[in-house]
Amino acid sequence: MSTVDISLLPPPDVIEPLNYETLLSTIQQRIIELTPENERAAVRATLALESEPLTMLTQAYAYRALLTRQRVNDAARAVMLAYATGTDLDNLVAAFNVQRLVIRPADPTTIPPTPAVMESDSDLRKRAPQAFEGLSVAGPTAAYEFFARSADGRVADAKATSPSPACVTVCILSREGNGTADTGLIDIVDQALSGDDVRPVADRLTVQTAEIVNYEIVATVYCKPGPEIEPIAQAALQQLQDYINTRHRIGLSVWRSSIDAALTVEGVVHVDLD
């Protein structure tokens, strides 16, 4: 069973576009409509003056109406998997019997204490719908992959294949280092996949690290003349790292054109890739 790519869903109609000027104009127009006809010209002239108390009152009301609509929009997003974030997302995915994974536990012994590194919203958002794959007891590929990804927060990706009948090989990619999964992580995943409610009795399971293909990016970035070179370089490196992180998955390629695009931030005029 394939899961829906929620990133491709159209924006929901329940999210209302907000415009302060439109709200203010609507409120003022309604006041004019409720005014006796012989007084409308005077009210209209009053509302045209920013210093008039009536104008200030309509502005304050329009601003409060804008905040109320924004709160309604936020509440609607909080119950949608594609838009929920933080603890809203944590509560939402609990309905899938899924919880946010710990990538690196907190360390209270350091000064200052080191907070825990948790699974990102985007990764949790992608993993939650895959929980339905885990409902099968027949050992489908997607079920093995879901349970492998959910076994430990350090698992960045997992792929299951069957090289021969009744044999299952699950390759895992680590978030740490260059992606090579160490023995400890492999053992954790193997144990998670070996439960009676996960692995069919006849399946012979092998868990191993994914094969890592190392690569190097060497680029010369040409910027517009000016003193602000360092912020441009930092922005380019951050955007490149964000792209690399999205490609840190089994079977995904890193494309030269995408590297070029990632490095081309505001202030960059040309990129040469070696």
Describe each model-derived feature in a short phrase:
Residues 1-137, 232-274:
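N-terminal polar alpha-helical/low-complexity "assembly arms" that mediate subunit docking
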Residues 133-252:
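Carbohydrate-recognition loop of C-type lectin domains
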